[in-house]
Amino acid sequence: MADLITVARPYAEALYGLAKESGQEQAWADALQALAAMIADVQAQAFLTDPERADAEKVSLLSAVPVAVDVKAWKAFLALLIHNDRWPATAEIGTLFADAMRRAEGVVDVLVTSAIALDAGQKTAVQSALERRFAGHKVAFREAVDAALIGGLVIHTGDLTIDASVRGQVQQLARTLRS
C-alpha cells in the first residue's frame, strides 16, 4: 500500500495542478473514481496484465470510461499510466487527488481510533483539541474502534500519526528496553 501511495503521489499532484488550472477539479475527481472502479474489475485487470495486448489496446479500453474532462489530456494521462505500468495505483491516485481537493478547501480529514467507542463528551473534547491543533482548518472527524489499542487513542491524518494508545506506549517501552 505504501509503495502504491509513493507511486501515485506525483501523478495525483500533477493531475490536481492540471485540474485546478482548468477549474475542473470535481470532473477530474469523478473521472479518476470511474477509472478506479473499472480497473478494480477482474476482467479489466486480466486485459491490462496480458502481455499480448499492445499499449494502444489498453489505453483504448480505459478510454471507454465516460469523462467530462479534456479528452486529449485524459488520453495522455491514460497512455502515461499504461506505458509506465502505473495503472495498479489508480485508486491511490484518486484518493490523493481527493485529499488535495479537500486540503485546498481547508479541510483536514482525521481518523481517530480508540479502544472503545467515544461518548459524546469525549468526541467533543477530541474535536476541540483537533481544531486547536489544525487551527485555520475545518476538521472532518471520523471514528474507529480497535480493542487491540487497550486504551487511549491513535490519531491519523495524511502523513501524521499520533499514537497515544496503551499498545503504542508498551511497544515504545519494548523498543527502548531492546536497545
Swiss-Prot record:
It comes from the Bacteria. Signal peptide: none annotated. One of its GO terms (molecular function) is proton-transporting ATP synthase activity, rotational mechanism. One of its GO terms (cellular component) is proton-transporting ATP synthase complex. InterPro entries: ATP_synth_OSCP/delta_N_sf (IPR026015), ATPase_OSCP/d_CS (IPR020781), ATPase_OSCP/dsu (IPR000711). It is found in: Cell inner membrane. Coiled coil: none annotated. Belongs to the ATPase delta chain family. F(1)F(0) ATP synthase produces ATP from ADP in the presence of a proton or sodium gradient. F-type ATPases consist of two structural domains, F(1) containing the extramembraneous catalytic core and F(0) containing the membrane proton channel, linked together by a central stalk and a peripheral stalk. During catalysis, ATP synthesis in the catalytic domain of F(1) is coupled via a rotary mechanism of the central stalk subunits to proton translocation. F-type ATPases have 2 components, F(1) - the catalytic core - and F(0) - the membrane proton channel. F(1) has five subunits: alpha(3), beta(3), gamma(1), delta(1), epsilon(1). F(0) has three main subunits: a(1), b(2) and c(10-14). The alpha and beta chains form an alternating ring which encloses part of the gamma chain. F(1) is attached to F(0) by a central stalk formed by the gamma and epsilon chains, while a peripheral stalk is formed by the delta and b chains. This is ATP synthase subunit delta. The lineage of its organism: Bacteria, Pseudomonadati, Pseudomonadota, Acidithiobacillia, Acidithiobacillales. The gene is atpH.
